[in-house]
Amino acid sequence: AQSYNETRAQVPFGFYIIMAAQFFSALADNALLIAAIYALREMQAPTEYEPLLKTFFTLSYVLLAAFVGAFADSMPKWRVMFISNAIKIAGCSMMFFGAHPLVAYAVVGLGAAAYSPAKYGILTEYLPHRLLVVANGWIEGLTVGAIILGVVIGGTLIRPDISQTLLAFDFPLIDTGVDTIGEMALSIIGVFYIIASLFNLYVPDTGVDHKQLKSNPFYLIHEFNHCLSLLWRDKLGQISLAVTTLFWGAGATLQFIVIKWSEVALNLDLSKASMLQGVVAVGVAMGAVAAAKFITLRKSVRVIPLGIAMGLIVLVMNFVHEIWLAVPLLILIGGLSGFFVVPM
């Protein structure tokens, strides 16, 4: 059997370009989430609007599930990812120019929904089967890490001391039009999207022939339902779909609960509460790497008890009121989540 280091050495360089593009795109998505929460609070919107941001973001994933796969397969994957990032930049720009954060973040979600099948599909085109577990470890680890780091960066950008320092920078003879904390944060987040788009341009061609697929929406819906039923009838497919659906659903909910919990239990403001989530990134990275190293596809279901343990530790967080105790527990939760979700 090949060692993990030998397998990693066989991964072509283009794979890391794909990972870099994915990292910066996901990083910007989640930094934008904090900027959107800040924008809602600045406009004194009802507090229940904040979790609705995630609902509006993921709406496209549900409504367009039957169509985004066909779109991703209709052209080279790098072009799909580039177009998707352009849509995200449009959503970020809408928020900058005063559109309601819920509407603007929904546009970003449209880009993310189109991006998702391309980022996974290109791996199967570009890498041999034996490298897919390692590749999935990278993509899940970097994605979750980008989620956490993006929230930290978003929280940092809205800190009064940091934001005022950044606003003090200016270009001679040029009026940038960036005058508020929100505009400054959105400008920097837009740069992250541009970096991701530049990486997309250097994603290697996989050599796969992209033929125009059927575009009839009724056919695509029928085909989607057929594939979905096949997955649910497969024993391992059932486990993978059920577990990952619950995992990401709970994770999206916890993203907002942790912020509110930090404000109530630890007396932290939005900036510090969002940065507290960053400590989870350490555990996520360790867990994802460990899963890629030790867990094969045949052994993937063996990680399910770790998901149960993770849930129990999340329950324990109800009784934590000190930051020195919260930090190691959040790192542990991150480690378990990274080790748990990669094989699934």
Question: Whereabouts are the PLM-identified features?
Answer:
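Transmembrane-helix signature of multi-pass solute transporters
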Residues: 87-97, 195-199, 286, 312-316
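Helix-loop interface residues and adjacent transmembrane-helix termini in multi-pass membrane transporters
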Residues: 12, 43-44, 74, 98, ...
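Transmembrane alpha-helix termini and helix-breaking/packing motifs in multi-pass membrane transporters
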Residues: 34-44, 93-97, 149-189, 264-266, ...
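C-terminal transmembrane bundle of multi-pass solute transporters/carriers
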Residues: 51-56, 60-70, 74, 78-80, ...
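Juxtamembrane intracellular "pre-TM" segments in multi-pass secondary transporters
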Residues: 2-15, 205-242
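Membrane-helix interface/capping residues of multi-pass secondary transporters
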Residues: 15, 47, 77, 129, ...
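Substrate-agnostic recognition of the 12-TM MFS/MFS-like secondary transporter fold
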Residues: 13-33, 53-72, 76-89, 104-161, ...
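Helix-loop junctions on the cytosolic side of multi-pass membrane transporters
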Residues: 121, 125, 179-182, 186-216, ...
